[in-house]
């Protein structure tokens, strides 16, 4: 179909198991972002290991179908979808939709060049904040507000460069384990950026995933530094093996 060969049904067993785990995460943790990161990283590893795009196509279809089913049958998932669709609706913008609405207002206020570094209005004179969670969930909105479209694109370019180098390290690795390790770590990193930036810009529903190396949070920063260290380890080992006689 469209140049994609569908493998035998029995080979989809691992995909079904991980899909079930991702859907369980969606039910128990109630976090679409974490579920998407988990399943997306698995699809990336599956593609690298098998070189079959059919697994990715079927996997994306399964995840979309599962997300649609649970959004139609679980109230809290449906509420999250409704807020994402129209955060400016009457009765929503002052409650559940306040966070994403203020995020969009802040980004629009930033314009092309931004209002200036450290010049965003985060706190109201009488107390409270205009942008909720400005150092964690919505820190990308603060970046767009202060540095504008140019600064926001520069931040995304840095992330894109890290992801490109990570996947290149995966292609240069000398053994299958190192290849899968580098590809999996890079996929997790890229998906983490996509989930938080996509949520802040209203591409996907907003979740509580942190922006790598920028959002406040000790464990998140340590985890991402460990991720980069492992990528550097794989890269160094591949370089040494390539230059050794």
Where are these regions (language model features)?
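A juxtamembrane structural motif centered on a specific transmembrane helix
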Residues: 192-245
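Hydrophobic alpha-helical transmembrane segments of multi-pass inner membrane proteins, especially
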Residues: 1-99, 137, 141-199, 226-230, ...
